[in-house]
Amino acid sequence: MRILLLLLLSPGFLLAQTKKAIDRKKSTITYSMNHLLHAWDGTSADLNGAVQLKADGSIEKVAIVSKVSAFDSKSSNRDAHLLEVVEALKFPNISFYSTSITAAKDGTLDVKGVLQFHGVNKETAFKATTKNLNGTTQVTGNFIFLLEDFKIERPSFMLKPVDNEVKVKFDVFY
């Protein structure tokens, strides 16, 4: 009973925080890759995640995960090969969780966190933008990662490997 009373009276408990699930019907993450002969995108609309808000409604923390197999590049052969290359059976998810989020008055966010992919945790930082839309909040942004940072051997086509750089764009609603 004393412990419960101490928890209830602690300053951290008094700070109101709200946790919201991301809107799985609207949220997407898209990767873009390039090869000497062509470029393509793959999109996942199968995201799980949560956003923790501070008392003032600003974002305090975020965590998002997607199955690697959920990304669709509109080419089943390319998607199947990508699943082999990234060892999706061994590492089925790609995820991000924030370690710090700093909000500016103009709606932009400086986000730092950890991208988990292919069994590797990599610190990353990017800018994002928030927009309030009739009771829903949209967060958009982009960042770049390198395949070699996640110990992924670059696939080749016609003896030429794909570019090392992967561009990621996200559009998350909550």
Where are these regions (language model features)?
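Low-complexity, acidic/polar, glycine-enriched regions of mature
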Residues: 17-174
